[in-house]
Amino acid sequence: MPLIYMNIMLAFTISLLGMLVYRSHLMSSLLCLEGMMLSLFIMATLMTLNTHSLLANIVPITMLVFAACEAAVGLALLVSISNTYGLDYVHNLNLLQC
């Protein structure tokens, strides 16, 4: 296995561990989630470049679109929680129910 793939998998694993360890604050959870999506995007792009498949070119772009949507929804939720409660704790998420 080439060294670049091992580095990307290590970045994904570190982001996953950060997501599990720092899950009390929403901002740190969003940053770890973005790190995971970035490493998955780079891995999908490298796999697409190595396979030389024209049909697989849409996969990294689709992942990038979903990552942007996830970031927008996460930041909107962060602003809503911060304006309402003044804190960004994840345990406040269940208080936003109608």
UniProtKB/Swiss-Prot annotation:
It comes from the Eukaryota. One of its GO terms (biological process) is ATP synthesis coupled electron transport. Its EC number is 7.1.1.2. One of its GO terms (molecular function) is NADH dehydrogenase (ubiquinone) activity. It is a multi-pass membrane protein. InterPro entries: NADH_UbQ_OxRdtase_chain4L/K, NUOK/Mnh_C1-like. It is found in: Mitochondrion inner membrane. It holds the Pfam family Oxidored_q2. The chain crosses the membrane at residues 1-21, 29-49, 58-78. GO terms for cellular component: mitochondrial inner membrane; respiratory chain complex I. Its main location: mitochondrion. Keywords: Electron transport, Membrane, Mitochondrion, Mitochondrion inner membrane, NAD, Respiratory chain, Translocase, Transmembrane, Transmembrane helix, Transport, Ubiquinone. It catalyses: a ubiquinone + NADH + 5 H(+)(in) = a ubiquinol + NAD(+) + 4 H(+)(out). Core subunit of the mitochondrial membrane respiratory chain NADH dehydrogenase (Complex I) which catalyzes electron transfer from NADH through the respiratory chain, using ubiquinone as an electron acceptor. Part of the enzyme membrane arm which is embedded in the lipid bilayer and involved in proton translocation. Core subunit of respiratory chain NADH dehydrogenase (Complex I) which is composed of 45 different subunits. Belongs to the complex I subunit 4L family. This is NADH-ubiquinone oxidoreductase chain 4L. It comes from Pan troglodytes (Chimpanzee). The lineage of its organism: Eukaryota, Metazoa, Chordata, Craniata, Vertebrata. The gene is MT-ND4L.
